[in-house]
Amino acid sequence: MIRVRWARLGAWFFAAATLISVGRPSLAVDWPTRPVRFIVTLGAASGVDIGARLFADRLSAQWKQPIVVENRPGGDGILAITSFLSAHDDHTVLVTPVAAFTAHPYFHDPVPYDAEKLTPIARISNTVVAVAVPTSLNVNSLKDLEALARAQPGKLNWTTATGFTDFVFAGYLHTVGLKMEKVPYKNPAGAVTDLASGTIQVYMPAYAIVRPQVQAGAVKVLAVTNHERFSGLPNIPTAVEAGYPSLEFDGLVGIFASPEMNAETRAKIAQDVRSVANDPAILERMTATGQIVSPGEGAEFEASIEKQKAPIAEVAKLFGNKPVQ
């Protein structure tokens, strides 16, 4: 009897010691200890903002701390990024499309922040990016669009958001050998209005921006640039499927840390983001905003960013733009 009790007691101590060694408290376990800030590079009600708020709501419940979402749109994402880095705070993270900063070296000399200080924590989603045309243009595919552009060189107008997507579409035109005229817009609402009326013929934005006009029948999506089809547009091909690989890119969106955040905390956040991403309710809401839920932790997210940088560098060289050293 005594032997059994000592055996049981010994087993209990062994189990307790094992739990202590495995679950030893770390900075990651103790984080967060106060409210967290999400700084978002885009404005309220954008797809990225909606996604940030959905994740913030679920993470706040897990972490038992409030999460404040701050929108800092403008300046090609630079306003939000510089504000984030100047906080020097391990309870502040940046939520942004990767495109917000990967093209900065080609447009800003000097770049007003150190990109090496942006550490990828977790990918949240891929924003669906659409190649959209007015329905009145009477084209039903990218092949049709190419044929029309060849028949009317320089007569068709196009636009995208400034920066990353500029390079992608310009690279596509160069690769295919088409001539279209770019029309710059400061406000996406103006571009959508002009697209629906036929004033411009091609617009390549986040699908969420043109979705109301697509549903109204005034705008048509010819393809999505993402590497996989979007469940919200099951009959629309990817650019690669349509025969135009130069248009392929994913609208990567993720969470970034500043140098003040340690690796253990970053790993905790990434793990918690993945658990939220697996929630069917989150998947449904994100799909409704034109986003593909695509969780990826630190190293995987960083690899996807690097993969996206390479083709943009090649396109930049075509137009004489060189990265700022």
Regions found by a protein language model. Give the residues of each.
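N-terminal secretory signal peptides that target proteins for export/translocation
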Residues: 1-6
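Bacterial N-terminal signal peptides
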Residues: 10-21
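N-terminal signal peptide c-region/cleavage motif recognized by signal peptidases
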Residues: 23-25
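N-terminal (or domain-start) structured segment
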Residues: 27-117, 155, 164-165, 177-202, ...
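An extracytoplasmic/periplasmic, membrane-proximal ligand-sensing/linker region
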Residues: 33-35, 175-178, 263-325
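Hinge/capping helix and adjacent helix->loop/strand transition within the periplasmic-binding protein
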Residues: 86-91, 106-190, 239-241, 252-285
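A ligand-binding cleft/hinge motif common to bilobed small-molecule-binding domains
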Residues: 99-109, 166, 170-175, 202-236, ...
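C-terminal lobe and pocket-closing loops
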Residues: 114, 210-278, 307-310, 324-325
